[in-house]
Regions:
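Charged C-terminal helix
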Residues: 213-253
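Conserved phosphate/ATP/ADP-binding segment of small-molecule kinases
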Residues: 92-167
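Short, well-structured alpha-helical segments that form the helix of a local strand-helix-strand
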Residues: 140-145, 200-215, 233
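Short pre-catalytic strand/loop immediately N-terminal to key active-site residues, enriched for Gly-Thr
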Residues: 138, 142, 170-181
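N-terminal glycine-rich anion-binding loops that anchor highly charged ligand groups
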Residues: 10-23, 35-47
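Glycine/small-residue-rich loop that forms an oxyanion/phosphate-binding "nest" at active or ligand-binding sites
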Residues: 54, 62-111
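Short, small-residue alpha-helix embedded
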Residues: 117, 179-209
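Glycine-centered short loops/turns at secondary-structure junctions
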Residues: 29, 76-77, 149
């Protein structure tokens, strides 16, 4: 469905992720736009099909854009995704995370440490890398989902998705994926593209399975992180609905 509609997705993301994220989204069939200026972020959010917000390289001007864009998306009934990168690492990040959380994201996607920190518990986050297991974040994910009325995806070696009542685990993926910067950030863009006009829970599960399956495909050919990136873009481009139906490893308890 996503390829047929090629949704326009606005991404207020970090400097590290922009290029990788745009290429990942284009390979998948979405239409990414990296629009973050305060003067236009809210106006653009009103016309985009979905919005993603990533707090990786924060600054006050960007924070203002994130809030106005999220409010505009809410006002227009457009879904938006929060990627709370290293949200527990500094006081500033915790403050910004709390402000964005209060705007009730449609989907929150983060690693276990980020989800635990966002829910308000001490987490063993080392910046952007997860020190906590996905299973440890399960309770925090449920609490966050019930607080926002949205979906929470805890991503790691296996992914957990919940909307507070429904649960799914996605087991697709490849060990090289964490070795390449911005692949997690780029996944947030794919989630944004998948949820445009769809049930957020099922669309998020599908997005994670698709992304992980592309990683598995890439891993079959790659000799290391460099060749993996190239093979991953190709896999995102070539995977179709039938491949996803056959290859998705989704557990619903």
């Amino acid at each position: 469905h996503m390829r047929a509609t090629a949704p326009l997705v606005q991404n207020i993301t970090n400097f590290v992720a922009m290029n990788v994220m745009a290429n990942v989204m284009l390979a998948a069939g979405a239409s990414p736009a990296m629009v973050h200026a305060q003067e236009e972020a809210a106006e653009f959010a009103a016309i985009a099909s979905a919005l993603t917000v990533n707090i990786g390289t924060l600054s006050p001007a960007w924070t203002a854009s994130m809030q106005t864009a999220a409010k505009a998306a809410n006002d227009r009934g457009k879904p938006w995704v929060l990627d709370p990168v290293a949200v527990g690492a500094t006081t500033y990040r915790r403050e910004v995370g709390a402000k964005l959380l209060a705007l009730n994201p449609t989907v929150i996607r983060g690693n276990a440490s980020e989800i635990i920190a966002l829910a308000g518990e001490g987490a063993s986050g080392k910046g952007v890398d997860a020190g906590d297991a996905v299973s440890q974040a399960s309770d925090a994910a449920v609490r966050l989902a019930r607080r926002t009325g949205g979906v929470v995806a805890v991503t790691g070696a296996a992914d957990l998705v919940t909307d507070g009542t429904r649960f799914a685990e996605v087991e697709n993926g490849h060990p090289l994926m964490p070795r390449i910067t911005a692949l997690g950030c780029s996944l947030t863009g794919i989630v944004g593209a998948f949820i445009a006009g769809q049930d957020p829970f099922e669309a998020t599960v599908a997005a994670l399975a698709y992304y992980g399956l592309a990683g598995e495909r890439a891993g079959e050919k790659a000799k290391g992180p460099g060749s993996f990136q190239v093979a991953f873009l190709d896999a995102l481009y070539t995977l179709d609905g039938q491949d996803l139906a056959r290859g998705a490893r989704i557990i619903r308890p």
